[in-house]
């Protein structure tokens, strides 16, 4: 059966020698990990959790979180990863909508859940797991039972495995139904990724509610990767973990790597164990990739979405001249560019909407057929991203369609302006949005976060841009302490637009 459940039941590693997960002082081999997953799966069945039931997961990165996830999937339950950045009001809304039967949560979230749990009439089982490093006695008691494979009802490839939430930058988050078959095909077709992760020591600092974090866990587990979990992303602590644990690969957002590099330049820890770093989730500045290559560390990045999972990847061996691209489609994925108004396929090099056909595609937004119909058309997924494919087959993303700035009839793509600004030394991150202009309709404005006490002026930024961009692309500049972001780490450009209009 081509399902993720079947993979967990029959193909999960069972080695007594290879370390599977490490949280603090606790280490499990794959054999011990396999045993605990089975024990928890059997305990879930005893508590009445069955195929199709929703199991919400609110835990910091650690072996309790991954064990709960695999145990639930093994019995055919639907895992609902919950962001720990949400406020009680937001969390209540998404959990009410997803109707979990069970909730597993870390001890640090007890206070927020005291407000949330009474609102959830669907809940039958609640379990505090302890912390990422120390499990609670109540949770540990679940592992006293049998460790044989659970006798459970088998799922079909079209059954939902994960209920993920979109970033919700334009309103309430939509619930993406990710199927067992889609994840199965992703694992089976990702031979090169699995080979690259085979036996590596992986620093699992990327929050487990991110799609990219889950992709790494799924692929890495079946590649016998060792996951060293950390519950936060403090760069100085991360450098220490990399050195002491001989970490070979990491997955994180681009801004994390900026902070990490700045910390390394101060502390000069040993990074010689690193083989490759991975990032994605937002545009990756070519300057950041170059800075890592300068110290001998390749930084690869990928393009994808919650709905489509991995779409394309770029690695340094593809050439720095393509570093600003989103790479080439992964195995099994087809990409075309269409006119968003007519649906006509556009020729090579022309900017339009990126549309993909992929065997890993979600099956729709739960209880939202209208939103589903807008993005799923004849087996193709409309990403909402504007971009083009060049003569070598590389995908270039120029922005979100709703983010494109129309300056007197000329299109300004925020990603292009952001890419230029990110090249300025001392810039931590930036976001470019369109603001009203009485003469041209819209004009670009850049919100910029400087790195520490760097002395960079508006004039410096504008002069730098004038050397590299057409006159109509030169933005207004405003320095800010931080950029507003949603719980997935994506910049909330609508907030910046409103801020600019009402300032």
Swiss-Prot record:
GO molecular function: acid-thiol ligase activity; ATP binding
UniProt-listed Enzyme Commission number(s): 6.2.1.-
Major enzyme class: ligase
SUPFAM superfamilies: Acetyl-CoA synthetase-like
InterPro entries xref list: AMP-bd_C, AMP-bd_C_sf, AMP-binding_CS, AMP-dep_synth/lig_dom, ANL_N_sf, ATP-dep_AMP-bd_enzyme
Keywords: ATP-binding, Ligase, Nucleotide-binding
PROSITE patterns referenced in this protein's UniProt entry, alphabetically: AMP_BINDING
Segments traversing the membrane: none
Family that this chain belongs to: Belongs to the ATP-dependent AMP-binding enzyme family.
Record PANTHER family: LONG-CHAIN-FATTY-ACID--COA LIGASE, NONRIBOSOMAL PEPTIDE SYNTHASE PES1 (EUROFUNG)-RELATED
Name by which UniProt lists this protein: Putative acyl--CoA ligase YdaB
Species, as recorded: Bacillus subtilis (strain 168)
Organism ancestry: Bacteria, Bacillati, Bacillota, Bacilli, Bacillales
């Amino acid at each position: 059966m081509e399902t993720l459940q079947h993979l967990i039941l029959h193909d999960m590693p069972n080695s007594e020698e290879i370390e599977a997960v490490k949280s603090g002082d606790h280490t499990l081999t794959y054999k011990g990990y396999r045993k605990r997953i089975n024990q928890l799966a059997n305990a879930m069945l005893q508590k009445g959790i069955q195929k199709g039931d929703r199991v919400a997961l609110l835990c910091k990165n650690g072996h309790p979180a991954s064990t709960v996830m695999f145990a639930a999937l093994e019995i055919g339950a639907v895992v609902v990863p919950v962001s720990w950045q949400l406020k009680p009001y937001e969390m209540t809304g998404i959990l009410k909508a997803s109707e979990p039967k069970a909730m597993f949560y870390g001890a640090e979230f007890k206070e927020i859940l005291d407000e949330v749990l009474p609102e959830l009439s669907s809940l039958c089982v609640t379990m505090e797991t302890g912390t990422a490093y120390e499990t609670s006695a109540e949770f540990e008691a679940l592992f006293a039972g049998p460790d044989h494979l659970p006798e459970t009802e088998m799922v079909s490839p079209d059954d939902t495995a994960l209920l993920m939430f979109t970033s919700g930058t334009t309103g309430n988050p939509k619930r993406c139904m990710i199927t067992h078959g889609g994840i199965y095909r992703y694992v089976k077709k990702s031979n090169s990724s699995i080979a690259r992760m085979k036996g590596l020591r992986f620093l699992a600092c990327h929050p487990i509610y991110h799609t990219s974090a889950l992709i790494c866990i799924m692929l890495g587990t079946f590649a016998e990767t060792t996951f060293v979990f950390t519950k936060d992303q403090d760069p100085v602590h991360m450098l220490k973990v990399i050195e002491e644990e001989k970490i070979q690969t990491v997955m994180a957002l681009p801004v994390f790597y900026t902070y990490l590099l700045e910390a390394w330049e101060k502390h000069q820890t040993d990074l010689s164990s690193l083989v490759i770093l991975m990032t994605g989730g937002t545009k990756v500045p070519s300057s950041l990739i170059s800075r890592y290559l300068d110290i001998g560390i390749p930084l690869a990045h990928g393009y994808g979405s919650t709905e489509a999972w991995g779409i394309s990847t770029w690695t340094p061996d593809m050439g720095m001249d393509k570093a600003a691209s989103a790479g080439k489609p992964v195995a099994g994925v087809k990409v075309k560019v269409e006119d968003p108004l007519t649906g006509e396929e556009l020729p090579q090099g022309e900017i339009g909407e990126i549309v993909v056909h992929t065997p890993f595609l979600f099956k729709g937004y739960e209880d939202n057929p209208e939103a589903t119909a807008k993005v799923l058309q004849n087996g193709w997924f409309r990403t909402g991203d504007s971009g083009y494919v060049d003569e070598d087959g590389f995908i270039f993303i120029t922005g979100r369609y709703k983010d494109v700035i129309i300056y007197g009839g000329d299109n300004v793509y925020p990603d292009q302006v952001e890419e230029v600004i990110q090249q300025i030394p001392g810039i931590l991150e930036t976001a470019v949005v369109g603001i009203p202009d009485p003469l041209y309709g819209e004009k670009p404005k850049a919100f910029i976060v400087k790195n520490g006490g760097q002395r960079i002026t508006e004039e410096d930024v504008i002069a730098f841009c004038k050397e590299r961009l057409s006159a109509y692309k030169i933005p207004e500049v405003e320095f800010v302490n931080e950029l507003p972001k949603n719980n997935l780490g994506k910049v909330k450009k609508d907030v910046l637009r409103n801020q600019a209009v009402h300032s």
